[in-house]
């Protein structure tokens, strides 16, 4: 049963091309490309697709539809109201102005509360997707569980405690 579900998740398609392009545009504005890599190298858009498909069940409260797709709808509505165009057709400057209004929980505009909650989900997934990828880990310069060079306790500290290393340790 689980293998059938995995196959469905891998082979199925949740978002259409416009939606995937919109997610890509959002992600590249939230976390712009740098010399270490970008959203595409990290597979962030693919992560959205996998999560949307895998969590689109009643057990997950139809997360893909009610949260991820709903976010795209809400962001498009705001852009349509402000600029007369869907998000994908807006300039980066226009989109950033929308994100500035919905990026923080301290905005008390009642009309933006849903967008604020949905943007928090998007931002979290973008950051998680990037920084858990090979590109993001390199960007962090994460070294993992690698030992440092350690030459022991400094001599002045050893003298303070009147101790020393045995010769065979040195």
Annotate each PLM feature.
Residues 7-9, 25, 36-170:
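Mature-region segments of soluble proteins
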Residues 1-25:
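C-terminal segment of N-terminal export signals and the immediately downstream linker at the start
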Residues 32-34:
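Short amphipathic, basic-aromatic surface patches that mediate peripheral association
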């Amino acid at each position: 049963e689980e293998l059938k579900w995995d196959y469905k998740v891998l082979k199925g398609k949740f978002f259409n091309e416009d939606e995937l392009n919109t997610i890509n545009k959002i992600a590249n504005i939230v976390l712009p490309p740098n010399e270490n890599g970008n959203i595409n190298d990290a597979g962030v858009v693919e992560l959205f697709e996998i999560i949307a498909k895998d969590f689109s069940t009643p057990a997950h409260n139809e997360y893909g539809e009610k949260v991820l797709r709903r976010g795209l709808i809400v962001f498009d509505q705001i852009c349509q109201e402000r600029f007369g165009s869907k998000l994908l057709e807006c300039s980066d400057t226009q989109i950033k102005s929308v994100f500035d209004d919905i990026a923080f929980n301290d905005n008390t505009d009642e009309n933006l509360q849903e967008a604020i909650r949905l943007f928090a989900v998007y931002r979290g997934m973008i950051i998680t997707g990037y920084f858990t990828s090979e590109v993001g880990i390199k960007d962090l310069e994460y070294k993992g569980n690698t030992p440092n060079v350690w030459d022991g306790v400094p001599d002045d500290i050893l003298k303070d405690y009147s101790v020393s290393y045995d010769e065979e340790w040195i």
